[in-house]
Design a protein with these regions (language model features):
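Charged, low-complexity intrinsically disordered regulatory/assembly segments
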Residues: 108-171
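Short basic helix-loop element that most often maps to the first helix and adjoining turn
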Residues: 5-21
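Short amphipathic helical patch at the helix-1/turn junction of helix-turn-helix
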Residues: 1, 11-13, 41
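Short amphipathic alpha-helical segments
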Residues: 7, 33, 50-51
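N-terminal "mature-chain" segments and other terminal, solvent-exposed stretches
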Residues: 32, 62, 67-69
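DNA major-groove recognition helix of helix-turn-helix/homeodomain DNA-binding modules
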Residues: 45-61
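Recognition helix of helix-turn-helix/homeodomain-like DNA-binding domains
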Residues: 26-41
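Helix-turn-helix/homeodomain-like alpha-helical modules used for DNA recognition
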Residues: 67-135
């Protein structure tokens, strides 16, 4: 689905009109309508303010994918996903346990240049399990934001400040 249609869906999920959104961001209602109906492409420099103006968790995933392509985490909403918070919590636990099991099976004592092709394939498998766990966790955060009315922007702002305070990041 196009990013314009994703913006329209996100705006509707949040109960925001085009007029209301246009008052929050530097875009006219008419331009928003053209972006949403694909008569115009959303300029890259407006994507951040539109996404933050709507503050819809699923839209953040779509914009991330649009900006980074293959190196992004998708929102887990497929046919086999139950988006109830309790179900998502169990999925996180399952995927995390799978990732830890794969990590435990690796030969951590060997330098990477000494690894066989089979061991490297095992590392790739572990990395895919880590991505599954990460995706399930990110999707749980999105579901919890929706369910409890939290701003995903505010959750991430607070988290990033806490990372800097704990010296996990440098900026």
């Amino acid at each position: 689905m196009s990013i314009g249609k994703e913006v329209a869906m996100a705006r509707k999920r949040k109960g925001i009109t085009q007029e209301q959104l246009s008052l929050e961001i530097p875009v006219s209602r008419e331009s928003l309508a053209k972006y949403e109906t694909e008569k115009r492409r959303i300029p890259k420099d407006l994507r951040k303010c539109i996404t933050e103006g709507i503050d819809d968790p699923q839209l953040f995933f779509k914009m991330w994918s649009e900006a980074a392509g293959h190196v992004s985490i998708p929102f887990f909403n497929g046919e086999y996903i139950d988006l109830h918070p309790t179900s998502m919590r169990y999925m996180v636990q399952h995927e995390t346990n799978e990732a830890l099991k794969q990590l435990d099976a690796l030969s951590w004592f060997k330098p990477s240049q000494a690894w066989s092709e089979h061991e490297k394939e095992s590392m790739k498998k572990a990395m895919h399990e880590i991505l599954d766990a990460t995706g399930s966790m990110m999707s749980l955060i999105a579901v919890l934001c929706d369910q409890y009315g939290f701003s995903m922007t505010d959750i991430f702002k607070y988290w990033k400040v806490s990372l800097r305070a704990r010296k996990y990041t440098d900026g």
